[in-house]
């Protein structure tokens, strides 16, 4: 995921790892993220609750040929560019077939066209377009629009802008130049309780990858059983102390 507004991409990755019961296979060592350590966020029993987790971990599901990188910390100042380089170098050396970045963008910075349409958008690098163009077309998804690079200037060049998207735009631009097959899926959101946004984003991804199947013939999102990680019980802290009442 990208560390972006509402942490939507990170929450969506949590849902994928928890639902598919992906196994932790290693760590992505980097000095670009603020150090952190905590208990196992996906603990299902007392036996595995004491396992430690850190700021960047790698999970795998070999049966689906799926690998997920989860980030749990923010970037150290001026280190985001270095992180992008390390990440894409790892992607190339590991020979990943495709990369999908889950992200979000500030909903209040949408233009009129974006306000009148779906809150979901996608971006594909040129080499990714060749391999998935037909599939994406069949989903009737909406591509992220290009907007003036300098909003106040009407004659400004047009480019992709993702306000609140963290490293999303930098990863996308670097992947274009390095000919990496990358897709960006994002949702326009506001800060707050972003669990519904994460569920929406992961269902958007599921339309394409079909990671889990509907429980009935009705493919509506409500029939998809996403498993909420145990750590989400403390998403907004440990609750109010009873002594207050």
Regions found by a protein language model. Name each.
Residues 1-98, 107-245:
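Accessory terminal and edge-of-domain segments that mediate assembly/interaction
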Residues 103-105:
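Internal, hydrophobic cores of structured domains that mediate oligomerization or house catalytic pockets
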